[in-house]
């Protein structure tokens, strides 16, 4: 059975790994399977799992959700951070869990670090002792990996500088947070629905499951807070950029206003209709330059008195 990654028996106080072929689903057993393997569908259907449930369990795309079935059976679809090598963490992996006839069946396409750690703990006889504890640890393991990734986002946010006008890091962090939020928000509702279903797995460990729900709620609130931080940084950068643009525009306008009268006078002299005034005088150019300087000075004093120059100094 190539689709069976691991098979554990939780019917005894210490979980034991099964190495024999699992033709039939047994209560208190955990079957961790490869979702894309061609034989898994026939195995599920041979064990009387409804075809609609099988289709949903093996679907290519799915969002986090909880689906109650008959006789205390249910399906829980979760998402986790992809922490595999060369993977983009925000491309979240999917863990599909089916509780059917007292057995827990989990399927995956991409290996999950959280599941791998649980399997390692079981191999070292340090893992969960029951299916209820196993499911809770899967949920909390996924929560923990999301928390670790959000720590890296927080470090990125702490490095933001409002004086740095480059928005590449801001946009990258914003995209990552939005990608995670897309799945984590419905995951919070899925875990809430699991708790409210009062399944025997949940009722045996109610406090642990509520703690897991509190954690995913806190994670969602953290994501919302970080998105607000990114938006605030972007607003501050835009504000600083607008202020700089306004200051430069004001300065150019002030300079143009100062030169406007002198430009008019020099242009008037350049018309040369009826001859240029002062051509016969050797001091004409000197007196004209002195007049321009006086005009510059008077304009500057006028602008200073009106407070126009103080505005550029303050900015």
From Swiss-Prot:
Periplasmic-side positions: 272-282
Single GO MF descriptor: magnesium ion transmembrane transporter activity
Cytoplasmic side: 1-250, 304-315
UniProt entry tagged with the keyword Metal-binding: no
Membrane-protein topology: Multi-pass membrane protein
A Pfam family annotated for this UniProt entry: CorA
Gene3D superfamilies: CorA soluble domain-like, Magnesium transport protein CorA, transmembrane region
Cross-referenced InterPro entries: CorA_cytoplasmic_dom, CorA_TM1_TM2, MgTranspt_CorA/ZnTranspt_ZntB
Catalysed reaction equations from the record: Zn(2+)(out) + H(+)(out) = Zn(2+)(in) + H(+)(in)
Keyword vocabulary terms for this entry: Cell inner membrane, Cell membrane, Ion transport, Membrane, Transmembrane, Transmembrane helix, Transport, Zinc
Entry's Gene Ontology cellular component terms: plasma membrane
Membrane-spanning parts: 251-271, 283-303
Signal peptide start and end residues: none
Compartments, record wording: Cell inner membrane
The keyword Cell inner membrane belongs to this UniProt entry's keyword annotation: yes
Subunit structure: Homopentamer. Can assemble pentamers in the absence of the transmembrane regions.
Family: Belongs to the CorA metal ion transporter (MIT) (TC 1.A.35) family.
Function in brief: Zinc transporter. Acts as a Zn(2+):proton symporter, which likely mediates zinc ion uptake.
Domain description: The intracellular cytoplasmic domain forms a funnel-shaped homopentamer. 25 well-defined Cl(-) ions were observed and some of these binding sites are highly conserved within the ZntB family. The presence of the bound Cl(-) ions increases the stability of cations along the pore suggesting they could be important in enhancing cation transport.
Protein name per UniProt: Zinc transport protein ZntB
Organism this protein belongs to: Vibrio parahaemolyticus serotype O3:K6 (strain RIMD 2210633)
Gene name of this polypeptide: zntB
